[in-house]
Regions:
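Compositionally biased, intrinsically disordered or flexible polar/acidic segments
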Residues: 1-175
Length: 175
């Protein structure tokens, strides 16, 4: 598991899962390709806003924006990929009188991002918007089983509207 953007280890106190600090990709290893650190205000990494629907709030308060890819060089086999997202730019709450409204790309109030995600050049999430699916400042995770051949697993991101981003990533080998 990777604590995207962070320079620190993070341990989930319930599962004892240790999240590794982020790093740029180097051949024979793993890491991000492209993108930059999200800063809500100058000099501060991430946001201090509460992120809902997760017990690991610090993991979701940072993100890599405009990310191109995340690559892992690893042995061939079957893996589970889990991506974690929280749109920290999108509007976080709907007002009471507007609860029935549905966020759409055409809505003038929509401030979220929409992007495509592929794994090893196979489309996975098309026109994906965490803000439309769950709202702003809320965690959403997406899982996929992948058969790796050729020694690498690459998750690619392509912007449709706004920017691509990633808050966290887990890769587990399935035995």
């Amino acid at each position: 598991a990777v604590n995207v953007v962070s320079n620190y280890f993070f341990t989930d106190d319930k599962s004892d899962l240790c999240w590794l600090p982020d790093q740029a990709y180097t051949p024979g290893s793993w890491g991000y390709i492209g993108g930059e650190i999200f800063r809500r205000s100058p000099g501060r990494i991430g946001t201090t806003a509460e992120v809902k629907d997760t017990r690991n709030v610090p993991l979701l308060q940072t993100k890599r924006k405009d990310i191109k890819a995340y690559r892992f060089d690893l042995p061939d086999g079957d893996y589970e990929v889990e991506l974690l997202f929280a749109d920290l730019n999108a509007r976080s709450e709907r007002v009471t009188y507007d609860l029935g409204a549905v966020a759409t790309l055409d809505n003038a109030d929509f401030r979220g991002s929409v992007f495509n995600v592929s794994v090893n050049n196979r489309p996975w999430l098309n026109h994906f918007s965490p803000a439309i699916e769950v709202g702003g400042n809320r965690c959403i995770s997406k899982k996929l089983h992948v058969a790796v051949t050729g020694g690498n697993l690459t998750v690619n991101f392509e912007a449709v509207k706004g920017m691509t981003f990633l808050n966290g990533i887990k890769i587990f080998r399935i035995h």
